[in-house]
């Protein structure tokens, strides 16, 4: 019986270890010599406690944790209409008992009216709506160089007549210089550039525990 219990404990430990590796992949500590600086969002966050939610119903942009600060998951749902904050997809209303609190971005937004744009040319991070507040789409384009704010991909210049206004994040950014990092170890949300302002890549790593706000994949310094 004792051997059986030990075997179960070992199996449980291996499952937890495998789960940790699933969330994180190894990054080298080498400096990418092309990278000179990064432009990163300067975000405030709020801690939301006493939650009854689950990973599916949790809000996109929020990270959910257990009582001891262990990362559980990222939220998967987002609002689809300015008029009602319903989930985009069907999720159960059951509470995930592992989740104790969430860390969510505290974002200001701006309403942009009188638009002539389309879903392809619309800005990433913006949500576009019809005149009556019905959700149309998320913008798909982002700037690819600090020097010129061109679209990342080829989009038509035609107006999507369904789109009347957009809700866009009002973000502050910070410029981080003197970096020794690489694309894998760079922070998610940051864009990395060469000395002449040419876009190199987006960072790929994010923190997974509130108690330990280090990079998920590496200890390469980014700030």
UniProtKB/Swiss-Prot annotation:
Induction: By auxin. SUPFAM superfamilies: Plant proteinase inhibitors. It comes from the Eukaryota. Coiled coil: none annotated. Disulfide bonds join 27-120, 31-116, 40-126, 52-95, 55-73, 56-91, 62-104, 119-137. The gene is ARPI. The record marks 29-30, 93-94, 157-158 as: Reactive bond for trypsin. Keywords: Disulfide bond, Protease inhibitor, Repeat, Serine protease inhibitor, Signal. The keyword rRNA processing does not apply. It comes from Solanum lycopersicum. This is Proteinase inhibitor type-2 TR8. Belongs to the protease inhibitor I20 (potato type II proteinase inhibitor) family. Residues 1-24 form the signal peptide. GO terms for molecular function: serine-type endopeptidase inhibitor activity. Sequence repeats lie at residues 24-81, 88-145, 152-209. The keyword Signal applies.
């Amino acid at each position: 019986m004792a051997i059986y219990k030990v075997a179960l404990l070992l199996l449980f430990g291996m499952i937890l270890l495998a789960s940790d590796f699933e969330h994180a992949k190894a990054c080298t500590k080498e400096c990418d010599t092309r990278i000179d600086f990064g432009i990163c969002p300067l975000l405030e966050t709020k801690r939301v406690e006493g939650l009854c939610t689950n990973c599916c119903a949790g809000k996109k942009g929020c990270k959910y944790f257990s009582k001891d600060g262990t990362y559980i998951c990222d939220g998967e749902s987002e609002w689809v209409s300015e008029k009602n904050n319903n989930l985009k997809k069907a999720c159960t209303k059951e509470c995930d008992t592992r989740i104790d609190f969430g860390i969510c971005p505290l974002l200001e937004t701006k309403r942009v009216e009188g638009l002539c744009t389309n879903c392809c040319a619309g800005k990433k991070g913006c949500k576009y709506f019809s005149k009556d507040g019905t959700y149309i789409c998320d913008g798909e384009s982002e700037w690819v160089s600090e020097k010129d704010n061109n679209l990342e991909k080829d989009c038509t210049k035609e107006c999507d007549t369904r789109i009347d206004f957009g809700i866009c994040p009002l973000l502050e950014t910070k410029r981080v210089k003197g970096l020794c990092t690489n694309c894998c170890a760079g922070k998610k949300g940051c864009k990395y550039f060469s000395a002449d302002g040419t876009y190199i890549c987006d960072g790929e790593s994010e923190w997974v525990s509130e108690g330990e706000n280090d990079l998920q994949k590496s200890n390469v310094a980014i700030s």
